[in-house]
Amino acid sequence: MQTESETSIAQNARPLATQPLGRLMRRYAVPCMTSLVVAALYNMVDQVFIANAPDLGSVGNAATTVVFPLTVAALAIAVMLGDGCCAFVSLMLGAGKQEDAHRAVGGTVTVSVVAGLVLMTAYLLFPDTLLTWFGGRVNAGTFEKAQEYFFWIALGVPLYVFGQAMNPVIRSDGSPTFAMVATLAGAAANLVLDPLLIFVCHFGMAGAAIATVAGQALTAGLSIWYLTRMKQIHLQKDSFRPRAHLLGKCAKLGMTSFLAQISLVAAMAATNTMLRICSAQDAVFSQEEFSAIPMAVFGIVMKVFQIVISCAIGLAAGCIPVAGYNMGAGRHDRVKGLLTRLLAAEAVVGLIALLVVELLPDQVMLLFGAQNESIHYTLFARRCFRVYLSMIVLACINKGTFIFLQSLGKAAASTLLSMAREIVFGVGLVLLLPQFFQLDGVIYSMPAADVLTAILSAVVLVRTYRSLETEK
């Protein structure tokens, strides 16, 4: 027999099984998408102000490109914990298992704090080695600025991991809007502090990093405040004791998110390395004054890509509570309808992005101080945008497919697709193609990887539709 508390929780969750799918997507996916886009803007905001600082410019942006993969590594841990917990909790709420839900959330809180502290320690102990691995030795100026920036970013890692892990947990509690507000508040703080610390206080790279960490601290603080006022999940002191069997299930569901991010780290390491090697062999970029341009431009292109792909991830991740609840409740017809709507939305996002990067690359680069750089900077950036992101529609659909499969509990298929994209195709092609096409090989590696991944995704999607039809 259900207690009064369990009955209240069930009533709060019931709209997931009854409300129109379009309305649920708007309620959950739009705030989630906004949160992730704003999170992606953290580093991009830094690059905009750094690019326009007279003493930083392209060298400063090259430095942030070196540090960026190490930020993504922290994000990988956060999304594994947060997305996995979100998917697990949604399934448990759909099945009416409230105890497992609150224990999973509490355990995730504890582990995210510990993981952030461990990663911060590693970053502070081995900064030079890590920066060298990710291409920091492209020239002396880039390495020096990367060291300055990375020190402060490393100090903020525990805050970043905790805040990003709690965001999907808050969504799973039925509060996607608060999750969005927590991220927006942090981004707003970063946006205000960046120009103040860089241009007024003249703190340079350190100022950009401190502004980022301050924003992360605000997001983490708001997340802590929400945990004391959850709606569907009632945390107790005992909830925060990690339970291996529950955390293992969460980790399994979040493994796709983790591998997607950590394999992106591997891909960025390979890309940065090949950029450094190929630039040294290029007639223009082998010159000292232009040597930082390829690294700086690729960093900007990747930040723009991160914003677009954050939209794609947000659309899919926002559907996790809806898909998970209906899957747990046996409503496979609604799951199938949600998948169709998601794929269509992903295609629209990708198409809009494609039009921007193909038609307006120069205008985008103006945000990043192109007017202060050489013609080589502008020409290389234009080519990178138009070629490197030419298959961004497929990239969005691929990413939506990976995450939606995760919400259905199909962790193996989701993980294999994600690994194929980032490691087999992503890393493989960025190492292979430059052997034949030099710097152009790096540029063509991403669209080629997206096309090959789309073929695999199509096969898995057909099978998923058939299984949902059979189980209806």
Cite the ranges covered by each PLM segment.
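Small-residue-rich hydrophobic transmembrane alpha-helices
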Residues: 61-121, 160-179, 295-355, 359-361, ...
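Hydrophobic positions within alpha-helical transmembrane segments of bacterial inner-membrane proteins
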Residues: 37-41, 116-120, 124, 161, ...
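Helix-terminus/linker motif at the lipid-water interface of multi-pass membrane proteins
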Residues: 37, 41-62, 131-140, 196-203, ...
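Transmembrane helical elements of multi-pass membrane transporters/channels
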Residues: 27-46, 152, 186, 215-219, ...
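N-terminal transmembrane alpha-helices
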Residues: 16-56, 68-84, 88, 113-120, ...
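Short alpha-helical transmembrane segments in multi-pass integral membrane proteins
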Residues: 1-32, 89-156, 200-255, 323-391, ...
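Alpha-helical transmembrane segments of multipass membrane proteins
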Residues: 44-48, 121, 165-169, 188-196, ...
